[in-house]
Structures are given as C-alpha cells and as structure tokens.
C-alpha cells in the first residue's frame, strides 16, 4: 500500500500555526514512508473563503519547505462529486430531507436546555411521508439534507496516536446535516457541507491516512459512518495534540501570534519554525536532538512517537532554535535576510554598493542575533557619522589619557583609509605602549570615541566598518571636541 496523506486547510484566514504543524506531520509521514503528500483546499464556505488566503496558505507552506506532490485541489471545483454522493445516500434511504426552520431548531434546543439535556436534533423529519413533505414545501420551506445516524451504533477506530477510540452514535447530536437548503426552489438541495465533502474527497483521492488535530475527533466518528455508507475504504486516523499556550489553553488569536506570517514578521527563519514544529508533539528517537532539517526529521518520524498530551508553545525554545540557524548561516547568505529589518529600523543601505560592507556587518552582529528583527538594534552603533555619546561614554572620555588616544587614533584613521584588522590591532598596541596607558583604557576610550559607549560589538571589526564608510574620522573628531 502506498501511503497517501493530505493537508486540507480552509482559506478563511492566513496559514495558522496549527495547520502548519499538521502539514509538517503529514509531510514527514509521507516522506518517511515514500508516500504522497496532497494539498486540498476546502473552500466550500463561500462567504469566508478568499483567494488571498488561498495564496497565503500555499506560499506559507512553500516558505516552510513543505512541497506537495499533488494538488492543490479545490472543493468548489468538485461540487458535482458531492451532489452525486448526496443523491446516492438519498436513493439508498441513508439520508433524507429535513424541513425544520431555524426557529423550530432553536425552540428544540431551548426545550432541551430547560431539561438539562445536551442539544441535539431530535430526528423529527426522519420518516416524513410524501404527503407531509409536499405540505411542508407548500409552506415555502426548502430542505436541508440530513444523514441518518443510529444512536445505538458504536463507532470504534484504532487511532495511531491515541489507541482505541470509542464513540457512541447517540453522542453525535442526532442526524447530521450534509447539505444546506438551496435558495433556488428548482434545486433539490444546496451547498454540500464539510463532513460530506471531506469523505468524498478522501475516497476519490484514495487517502490512506488522515493526520489532523484532536479537535476533529467528533468529526472522525461522523465521517467513518459516511465512508461506510458511500462504500469507501476507511482511512487510518491519527489525531495530533493541540498546541497550547503557557497557561495550558489552546493557542488562539488572543495569544497575539498565530499565523505563519506573524512569525515571519517577527524575524524567525523558516527552517527554525519547521524544526520547532516537529518538536511540538513529536519526540525524536534521540530525545536530546533538537536541531534537524525536515529531511533529517523525516528519516526518524513515526506516529507512534507523537504524544497524546497537548504541546505547550515555548517561545524561549523557538528563540534558541532560531538563533542556532542564524549563527550557522554564512554572512553572505545572512545579508539579504537582514536588509529588510535594517531598513525597518531606519538604517538605509544600498545592497549593490554596500555588499562587502554588509557582509562585514553580518559577520560582526550575526553571532549576537536571536531573531532577524534584532539586526537594527544590534547594528545601531554602526550607522551614520553622528556620534551619540551615552553617559558611560562621556565618563570614559574624561579619564586621563582618553583624549590623547582619540587624537592619535584620528590621525591614524586619516592616514590609513584602507584599514585592516591587523593594522587596527597594531595601532591599539602602539598607543598602549607609547602613551603608557593600560590596554583597557585605550580600548574603552577608542570605543567611546567611535560608538559613544564603552559597551558594544567587537571594537576592531566596528572600527573597520566605520572606517570603510568614512564615519570613523567624523565621529572621532566629534568625540575630541566633546566637553
């Protein structure tokens, strides 16, 4: 048997981290087994589905490195398949027309609530006679289509993550709606609904394994009945744990960040997000391993090692993983990733003219980055010819010998336009010896004169970057003139 799995998002919003994590697990399982990973867009909610969300979902999956083998398939392009299946169920007596109005259904729920009963449809239109149906139609009522659910039926499946799951038919809320009422009196029924469409798609696409969130367990019980009724093979199910916030509640928009776009804007690399999502519910065979590519994770992946318990989202862990990927990037590859964040922080750069300088900057600040958004802050002291003296810098310039260091460094900078690291290091050693100062005094004074503070990135590399831009001499001049 060739494994066939699918990720089936609804384009009613941008790619959510929960959907992305489900996509990661499906992708890993498909690659581990040599199977097929299918993208299916469940866009039957015509009011909320939008083309821009469809595009966002696809681009988000691609950004994460989750390439699909088949698709994307769109449910709105398969409506005939669903209508055919609904008609089949009607012809077999497994589905029927229900003419209940929304007011009647609300009255039903209120009566059940008053008796402390769980809300459910009471199946009152299950066995209407043709005359009763005709009378209801004469009132102008348009029917929904409901699928018969046997309250006595016990639905059992062996979940690949949760073990045996048992669901009682009486707990499914009564006969379920599988098609809306049509606004057109000439049509037998309206828009097919989620549970029916999903099952028809899975049968037509020969899906062998359905890997999705545990919030779909009730849907699975309903869908198993539909697979059987339509004569399709029931796939193997695996229900993954929910992603939780630090309080142990389901991660939601109230937590501030939920879409992949949000994480991207916050400066996370796709490799880091994909890596972290692997660990949100799955434990590698080597539980100490935390950094791996998707391909490396796929070699080890199994559903048996996916946890049942909810996976708490850990920002510190994600930050650490992201920093590992950032620190491993060659400076030349880091540069194009930094530029948007440098510009967002108010630093203007010319990638063509400043390429070598930017590589030097990336080399300098790269090891201190946790997120790409840190770039503007980490490089703050290295842009512009204006010296902003902080309090610690002013104090350092008042130390005996500090101004002599700056004057000598200014002369040296003016005479050495093509400064190298070795030359900068040699000048510091020369000043230490000739001025009779401690090396720490020389370095702190020079740092204060170049960057306005005694704290900051590596002094020698910073001096080179400022010298290459012509900012070193300007800043040193300002520092010497400072009172």
Swiss-Prot record:
Ligand binding (ATP): 253
The family database entries (SUPFAM superfamilies) matched by this protein are listed as:
An anticodon-binding domain of class I aminoacyl-tRNA synthetases, Nucleotidylyl transferase
Top EC group: ligase
Q: Per the UniProt record, which EC number(s) apply here?
A: 6.1.1.17
The primary site where this protein sits is cytoplasm
- Extract the Gene3D superfamilies matched here: 1.10.10.350, Glutamate-tRNA synthetase, class I, anticodon-binding domain 1, Glutamyl-trna Synthetase, Domain 2, Glutamyl-tRNA Synthetase, Domain 3, HUPs
The record's subcellular locations are: Cytoplasm
Q: Which Pfam families match?
A: Anticodon_2, tRNA-synt_1c
Give the motif span ('HIGH' region): 9-19
- List keywords of the entry alphabetically: Aminoacyl-tRNA synthetase, ATP-binding, Cytoplasm, Ligase, Nucleotide-binding, Protein biosynthesis
Tell me a GO cellular component. Answer: cytosol
Q: Which InterPro entries match?
A: aa-tRNA-synth_I_cd-bd (IPR045462), aa-tRNA-synth_I_codon-bd_sub2 (IPR020751), aa-tRNA-synth_I_CS (IPR001412), aa_tRNA-synth_I_cd-bd_sf (IPR008925), Glu-tRNA-ligase_bac/mito (IPR004527), Glu-tRNA-synth_I_codon-bd_sub1 (IPR020752), Glu/Gln-tRNA-synth (IPR000924), Glu/Gln-tRNA-synth_Ib_cat-dom (IPR020058)
Protein's UniProt keywords contain DNA repair: no
Entry-linked NCBIfam families: gltX_bact (TIGR00464), PRK05710.1-4 (NF004315)
- What exactly does this protein do? Catalyzes the attachment of glutamate to tRNA(Glu) in a two-step reaction: glutamate is first activated by ATP to form Glu-AMP and then transferred to the acceptor end of tRNA(Glu).
Query: Which family is this protein grouped under?
Result: Belongs to the class-I aminoacyl-tRNA synthetase family. Glutamate--tRNA ligase type 1 subfamily.
What is this protein's record name? Glutamate--tRNA ligase
Q: Which organism is it from?
A: Synechocystis sp. (strain ATCC 27184 / PCC 6803 / Kazusa)
